[in-house]
C-alpha cells in the first residue's frame, strides 16, 4: 500500500465523495487515483476560494466532509474559505500539494513547506489539525491523526500537506497491519446522563417564561425536528442565532425568529421585556451577532442560563451561566427525549410569527425596485423544495426580513466570518449535496463580481442553481457607514455591470429586470429555469441600506 492508497482509503472511510479544486502537478498521482474510483466526484472549480466555499456548502447541506485540492499560490487563495469553515465549525479536508521533500527550503518554485513560504503555520491557525508529510516513516500516523481530527467535535477543517514524491511511495511493511485502524469512526462525546436531563427538565417545569436558543454549533447535528418536538411537549418558545438560522422553521407557532442582529425583535423582546427567566442555549457562542455587538442589555439579563456546547471554552465566555453542559446538541436532545416528559405550560408573552409578506411593503422611487419587493416576490413564487443560500452584505438582511424559513434545513448563510462571495460557490455545493432541491442564492453585485465565474462550474457539471443578484452598482455595506461624511464613490461605487450578460457568456441563462413591472415575470422565469440561471435585478442604491439594529 502506498501513501496515496492509504490517503484515498481514509477519505473513502470518512465518507468523502466530493473533491474540488484546480489541477496541480503536485497532486497528479492522487488525482489519477481518485478519478479511477467511482466513489469520488471531482469538481473542477474556477478559483481555489470558490472550491473552498463549494466544499463548505456541500458539508453544511449533507453533513459530510468534502475535500479541496490546491497547491502553491492556490493554497493562499483558499485561506478565506478555510477560516470561514473554522469559525462556523464546518468539516473540510484541504490537501495541498508540495514540492519534493528534497527541495524543501531550496527556493524551489512555489515551495510552501515549513522550510519555504511556511504556509503550514497559517493552516495550523485555522484548522483543527495541520500536518506535513515529510517522510514515509511518519506518513501513516500523520494522515491518521488528521482524519481523527476531521471526525472530532467541535467540527472544523483539517489540512494535509503532501509532497509530490511521496504519493507513490510504499508504506513500510510493519505499518500495513494498522492502516485500517479506526477508519470512519466518528468520535462522539458521551451523551449527558439522566441526572443532567432531570436537572434541565426540572428547571423548565419551574420556569414561567423559558426560552430555547439554537446556534450554529448544533447545525450539523441535524436535531431540528427532534428539538421542536420536545418544545411542543413543553410549550417551550424557541429562536435561533443569526448564524443558526435555518435549523428550525420560523413559521412554527412557538418560533420567536432570530435573536440578535437581523432578527425582527420578537426574540429580544421576549428575552428582555417579558422577561425570560430560563435561557437554554445549545451550540451558541454568544458573540457580537446574537448580543447585538455586546449590547449593555445583556449585562442586566435576568434569566437563569443553561449553556450546552461541545467546546468547554464557549461556556460562560460572555454570559453568566448557572449550568454548563459540555456535549453535542444531538446528545443533549437525545437525553431530554429519554428523560421524563416535561410539564406542558402555555407560556406568556409569545408573539405570533411575523407574516411572510408584510403589509405596506416599502417602494423605491418611480419604477425602481426595493429589495423587500424582490424578497416578497421570491417568497411568493418559491417551490416547496426550495433552499435559500444568502451571501454577504446588505442582501443578507433583506433575506432575513423578507423570506421566512418554512422548513428546517432549507436556509444557509455565513453570518459570522462573512467572506464576500462565499454564497456564490457555496450554493453550488448545497445543490451538489441535494440534487432534488432547487437552490436559490441571494447575493449582491459586489460579491457576484468576486466569485461569479463559478457559474461556469455549475454549467460544466449541470448543477441547477438560481442566483438572484441585487445590482445597485455599489458595495452597499461599505457605502452606508461613510455616507454623509465623505463621497462614497472611492470606497463603494463599482459602476453599472450587466451581470445577466456575464451569465450568458459563461453558458448560463441570464435574465435582467430593470423596473417593477418586470419583476414578477422575471422571478417566475428565473425560478422555472432548469439549469444555472442568474436573475440580475436593478435595485435603487438609495434604498439598499437596511437597519440591522446594532447595539439595541
Curated annotation (Swiss-Prot):
- Annotated thiamine diphosphate binding lies at 48
Keywords associated with the record: Amino-acid biosynthesis, Branched-chain amino acid biosynthesis, FAD, Flavoprotein, Magnesium, Metal-binding, Thiamine pyrophosphate, Transferase
Listed pathway(s): Amino-acid biosynthesis; L-isoleucine biosynthesis; L-isoleucine from 2-oxobutanoate: step 1/4; Amino-acid biosynthesis; L-valine biosynthesis; L-valine from pyruvate: step 1/4
Q: What does it catalyze?
A: 2 pyruvate + H(+) = (2S)-2-acetolactate + CO2
Q: Where does the chain bind Mg(2+)?
A: 445
Any idea of its EC number? 2.2.1.6
Q: Which GO terms describe its biological process?
A: isoleucine biosynthetic process; L-valine biosynthetic process
> Which residues does the annotated region (Thiamine pyrophosphate binding) include?
394-474
Gene3D superfamilies referenced in this protein's UniProt entry, alphabetically: 3.40.50.970, TPP-binding domain
Upregulating conditions: The expression is up-regulated in the mid-exponential and extended stationary phase.
Pfam families xref list: TPP_enzyme_C, TPP_enzyme_M, TPP_enzyme_N
State the InterPro entries in the record: DHS-like_NAD/FAD-binding_dom (IPR029035), THDP-binding (IPR029061), Thiamin_PyroP_enz_cen_dom (IPR012000), Thiamin_PyroP_enz_TPP-bd_dom (IPR012001), TPP-bd_CS (IPR000399), TPP_enz (IPR045229), TPP_enzyme_TPP-bd (IPR011766)
Q: How is the cofactor bound?
A: Binds 1 Mg(2+) ion per subunit. Binds 1 thiamine pyrophosphate per subunit.
| Binding positions (FAD) | 262-285, 309-328
Q: Which metal ions or organic cofactors does this protein require, according to UniProt?
A: Mg(2+); thiamine diphosphate
The EC category is transferase
For this protein, the record's CDD domains field holds: TPP_enzymes, TPP_PYR_POX_like
> Which Gene Ontology cellular component annotation is one that this UniProt entry carries?
acetolactate synthase complex
Question: GO molecular function: any one?
Answer: acetolactate synthase activity
Per UniProt, subunit arrangement is: Heterodimer of large catalytic subunit and small regulatory subunit.
Job description of the protein: Catalyzes the conversion of 2 pyruvate molecules into acetolactate in the first common step of the biosynthetic pathway of the branched-amino acids such as leucine, isoleucine, and valine.
Against PANTHER family, the record matches this protein to:
ACETOLACTATE SYNTHASE LARGE SUBUNIT ILVB2-RELATED, THIAMINE PYROPHOSPHATE ENZYMES
| Family to which the UniProt record says this protein belongs | Belongs to the TPP enzyme family.
- Give the protein's recorded name: Putative acetolactate synthase large subunit IlvB2
